[in-house]
Swiss-Prot record:
Changing residue 154 to S: No effect on protein trafficking and subcellular localization. No significant effects on apicoplast metabolism. Pathway: Cofactor biosynthesis; iron-sulfur cluster biosynthesis. Participates in sulfur mobilization (SUF) pathway for iron-sulfur (Fe-S) cluster biogenesis. Enhances cysteine desulfurase activity of SufS. Probably functions as a sulfur acceptor for SufS. Keywords: Apicoplast, Plastid. Monomer. Interacts with SufS; interaction enhances cysteine desulfurase activity of SufS. It comes from Plasmodium falciparum (isolate 3D7). This is Cysteine desulfuration protein SufE. One of its GO terms (cellular component) is apicoplast. Transmembrane segments: none annotated.
Length: 249
């Protein structure tokens, strides 16, 4: 093979190698650009504030962002949530809705409301506080987890059981046991069972369930959870009514 043919072969090989390297570099740059776009999109998406409840279900990969970033658009939205809650509960707000004393709360429930009112007006912090409270709930024996004690119409599985005891004044009071398999729902169950334990059934029946609007919790609850809360309160009041009837007999 003479020198001219050898040079020609080397030249062709050089061109092939150059083209191969060029193709690899183009693909590498394209991959980097796509990865940068994905990272940029992810950063932008994590900063989105979800104003409408329906938008939560549209984002499958970010279910926690709703609790962290959801805030009502304006005062009218917050007010409409309270109106919906009042309509569902069947209870009217007092003449002065901001007056905590008009909701006939037990001392324990009053302290809980004051705790949430002292917190920053942030759905994220308040939802985390509800979840932390749920961890304090006492375990319910399996023998009480029966159909009779189950709260129907809740998104999570919820059980409520009343224990009638005598206090120091020889009066009949109720100690509540509760259970739920949901994080937020378990916190709500704890707030109610702890706040209503140790009181007479007639005092519990006077409690206006709309007190939850004072805490700010109802502003980040979905409609299904609001219904669940009201069903829990309704179950508690049914138990109290039946206990009072048995006491009279």
């Amino acid at each position: 093979m003479n020198k001219k043919k050898l040079k020609a072969h080397f030249f062709v090989l050089y061109i092939i190698c150059s083209c191969f390297i060029l193709i690899l570099s183009i693909k590498h740059d394209k991959y980097n650009n796509e990865s940068k776009k994905k990272k940029k999109f992810f950063k932008i998406r994590t900063k989105i504030i979800f104003y409408k409840l329906k938008k939560v279900n549209q984002i499958k990969n970010a279910p926690q962002l709703y609790i962290q970033f959801y805030k009502p658009k304006c005062h009218k939205t917050t007010q409409s949530l309270k109106d919906i809650f009042n309509e569902l509960s069947g209870n009217k707000n007092p003449e002065n809705p901001k007056n905590i004393d008009e909701y006939n709360l037990t001392p324990k429930l009053k302290k809980t409301v004051e705790l949430f009112q002292s917190m920053p007006n942030s759905p994220y912090y308040k939802s985390q506080q509800v979840i932390l409270m749920g961890k304090k709930i006492s375990s319910m024996p399996d023998k009480h987890k029966i159909r009779q004690n189950q709260v129907l119409g809740c998104q999570s599985v919820v059980y409520i059981y009343p224990k009638v005891e005598e206090n120091e004044d020889k009066k009949k009071v109720i100690v509540w046991l509760g259970h739920s398999d949901g994080l937020l729902t378990k916190g709500i169950v704890y707030i109610l069972t702890d706040g209503l334990s140790g009181y007479m059934p007639e005092d519990i029946l006077k409690v206006n369930p709309n007190f939850i609007t004072l805490t700010g919790i109802s502003e980040f609850l979905t409609m299904s959870r609001i219904n669940g809360y009201l069903n829990i309160m309704n179950k508690i009041k049914i138990f109290c009514t039946n206990i009072l009837k048995n006491m009279d007999n």
